[in-house]
Structure formats: C-alpha cells, structure tokens
UniProtKB/Swiss-Prot annotation:
The gene is NPY5R. Disulfide bonds join 114-198. CDD domains: 7tmA_NPY5R (cd15398). The chain crosses the membrane at residues 43-63, 78-98, 118-138, 157-177, 209-229, 370-390, 408-428. Belongs to the G-protein coupled receptor 1 family. This is Neuropeptide Y receptor type 5. The lineage of its organism: Eukaryota, Metazoa, Chordata, Craniata, Vertebrata.
C-alpha cells in the first residue's frame, strides 16, 4: 500500500549520488518537498478515521454474524468470513501507518517495522484480492454444476491456505529490499537530525518495475478478468434457464391454440341475474374446494323441440331419459366436479407466468448486484495501481508539492473497497443479512 509513497522518497533520494558541488548548488532543500497535504491534514485525519472505523466495524459485524452459525456455514460464507478478516488487516496495517508517514514526513516505528510493515500491508491487500477471485470461481462452479456440488470444508481450508501461501510468496521481496535512511545525511541539514525514512532499496530500477508490473497483474488485471468472466457466465446461465422456461410456456400455448382454437373465438354471452349470483357464490366459497376442483354453472334449459323429437328413432327415448335423469341441475346453484389434467392447464400456465416474473425480477437483481461488484473493484483500485505505474516509469509527471496529496486520494479510494465489501458480500446476501439483523438486535438489547 505504501509503495507509491516510497517512490516519492526514492525520487527524493535519487540525487544522493551527485557530486558535492552539485549538491550544494542545485539539490533542493527539504522545504521544497513541503506538500499541499499540510494544508489539509485535519481533513485527512477525519476522513481516514471515518473510513477506517467504517471498514473495521462492518467487517467485524460480518465475522461475528458468521461465527454465530458455524455449524451451517457454506463454502461462500467461509470465503466471505476470510475476506472480512483480510479487510480488517488491511484497515489495521495500511491506514494508520500510511497516514502517519504522510503527515509527519518520517518513519517513526523503527528499523524492524520498516522491514515487516510493508510486507504485511502488501500481503493483506493481496490476500483480500485473491479471496475475491476465489468467491467468483466458487459461485461459477455452483451455477455450472449445481447437482454435483461436492465442495466441502476441507476444500475451503485448502483454498484459503493456497491464497495465503501465494500472498506470502509474491510479497516476499519487500522485507529484503527495504531500508531505513537518515534524512540528515541525505539533505545535509542539522534540522533533520534523528529523522528517518523507510524506503525501497532495489538493486536496479528494472527490479522495481518488474515487481510493480507483477503486482498490477496479480492485484488488479487478473481479479478484474476473473470477476468479469465469472459473473458474466452466471448471468448468462440464469438468463438461459429463464428463456427455456419461456419457450416451453410458448410451446404449450401454441399447442393449446392448435388443438382448441374455439376457446379464443367464442362469442361473448351476457349473464343473467341468476348467473351473476352463481358467480358470486363461486367466488365466495372457492376456498372450500381443493385446487383440483372447479365449479361451473348449469347449462341453460332448452325449450322442447317437438319436430326434432318426432324425427328421432323410437329406441332413442330410453337413452334420452337416462341422460336427462343423470344431468339434472338445481337452478341457480353451481355444480362442483374434479378438473381433469388437461382442463387445469390454464391454472398451470398462470402459475408458470407468475414464477417466470419472479425469476425475471430475481435475475435482474442478481445482474445489478454482480455489475456493482465489478464496478466497485475496478473503480476503487484502478487509481492506486495507475498512480504506481506512472510514478515508476516517469516520476516527474507529478510535482513534489502535490505528490502526497494525489497519493492520499488514490489510497483512500483503495481503502473504500474495504468498507464496501461488507455491504456487497454481506448485507446484500440474504442468509448473512438475516444473521446480521438478529446480531444487531441482540447488541442493541444488551
């Protein structure tokens, strides 16, 4: 986290190899490196304090909520808990030490901490980023293979151990290539006695540039690509499943229209008062019948047709009498009967339509949530990595006076990700959200 700030001090110390005459005539004095941060130090202290407390408390609540239900933890929740722990380390290691070095223009934590603290800062940030990649990969695996999902706790432990091992391995050069430099010898000023700076001391600029590019690839480009690919695949899988259901519903509707076209083209019938009463009776007592039962109105009685009856054969009278006796209806009272599966298709289609609408709403919320995750990561970390690359390749683009102010702005944007991760991965997670609400209620009551 402090690599960009150390570039500023490395640039300050780069002229140390000049001749003594050049140093006495052209080397800038310490007052030339007075920063515009000095005019905003109280504002920066308040802003850093707010961001640090917000990130610490948010991630601590996530950890406490997940610790309460350790028996019901899943792979994603296990990774979210480790993400909250690494973000707490980022807040503890990066915020106070960086702000102190910026405001005091010196390193006041000793030689041992000069070797340890940059290493811990880099490891905590890198582990947090690698856990984001792990969460994206696990979600992709759960969507693509929902039935054969055999991720156990041992897989989670192995994944976390791999993440921390990679973090320690990638950041291992930092303790070696850091040193404590005394400002009095550098600037030849008695006013700077007993003041030190913790700076990088690489064998050559090529080593420093190679390390900068490797961090850019591992901490920003690779996570951004993994998040984009994984979340895009998740959204596509959800949309494909939704389109399959819609296509099946449309196919069923086409089959119904083909087999029973008369249902859509029947004339409108005006209901009488008795029929209206029957419909109100059905609506009033529909809860008394099961879902497979329906109520219909009796067929209106037809006037006797003497001419038609005369044309019928003689033996048809018995059949007609049996039919009339078995189909007697009480006038004005609906008849209830069991609906056949093919007659219940309209109710089924209505339920499918409602489920499709719910899935559409849920898929839109998932799409917005995943898009916000990608944008938050890209926007929060891009300025800091871009600042690091620019200052490594051309350290004269930013003036000495505004160097630390620009760095503080980029650093605060990176710290904002530690504040937003609990919201995006915890408070917007329905399972964790319920645990958080119960935890907050318990804390409020106590």
């Amino acid at each position: 986290m402090d690599l960009e700030l150390q570039d500023f001090y490395n640039k300050t110390l780069a002229t140390e190899n000049n001749t003594a005459a050049t140093r006495n005539s052209d080397f800038p004095v310490w007052d030339d490196y007075k920063s515009s941060v000095d005019d905003l130090q109280y504002f920066l202290i308040g802003l850093y304090t707010f961001v640090s407390l917000l990130g610490f408390m948010g991630n601590l609540l996530i950890l406490m909520a997940l610790m309460r239900k350790r028996n019901q933890k899943t792979m994603v929740n296990f990774l979210i808990g480790n993400l909250a722990f690494s973000d707490i380390l980022v807040v503890l290691f990066c915020s106070p030490f960086t702000l102190t070095s910026v405001l005091l223009d010196q390193w006041m934590f000793g030689k041992v901490m000069c070797h340890i603290m940059p290493f811990l800062q880099c490891v905590s940030v890198l582990v947090s980023t690698l856990i984001l990649i792990s969460i994206a990969i696990v979600r992709y695996h759960m969507i693509k293979h929902p039935i054969s999902n055999n991720l156990t706790a041992n897989h989670g432990y192995f994944l976390i151990a791999t993440v921390w091992t990679l973090g320690f391995a990638i950041c291992s050069p930092l303790p070696v290539f850091h040193s404590l430099v005394e400002l009095q010898e550098t600037f030849d000023s008695a006013l700077l006695s007993s003041r030190y700076l913790c700076v990088e001391s690489w064998p050559s600029d090529s080593y420093r540039i190679a390390f900068t590019i490797s961090l850019l690839l591992v901490q920003y480009i690779l996570p951004l690509v993994c998040l984009t690919v994984s979340h895009t695949s998740v959204c596509r899988s959800i949309s494909c499943g939704l389109s399959n259901k819609e296509n099946k519903l449309e196919e069923n509707e086409m089959i119904n229209l083909t087999l029973q076209p008369f249902k859509k083209s029947g004339p409108q019938v005006k209901l009488s008062s008795s029929h209206k009463w029957s419909y109100s009776f059905i609506r009033k007592h529909r809860r008394r019948y099961s879902k497979k039962t329906a109520c219909v109105l009796p067929a209106p009685a037809r006037p006797p047709q003497e001419n038609h009856s005369r044309m019928l054969p003689e033996n048809f009278g018995s059949v007609r009498s049996q039919h009339s006796s078995s189909s007697k209806f009480i006038p004005g009272v609906p008849t209830c009967f069991e609906v056949k599966p093919e007659e219940n298709s309209d109710v089924h289609d209505m339920r499918v339509n409602r489920s499709i609408m719910r899935i559409k709403k849920r898929s839109r919320s998932v799409f917005y949530r995943l898009t916000i995750l990608i944008l938050v990561f890209a926007v929060s970390w891009m300025p800091l990595h871009l600042f690091h690359v620019v200052t490594d390749f051309n350290d004269n683009l930013i003036s000495n006076r505004h160097f630390k102010l620009v760095y503080c702005i980029c650093h605060l944007l990176g710290m904002m990700s530690c504040c937003l991760n609990p919201i995006l991965y915890g408070f917007l997670n329905n399972g964790i959200k319920a645990d958080l609400i119960s935890l907050i209620q318990c804390l409020h009551m106590s």
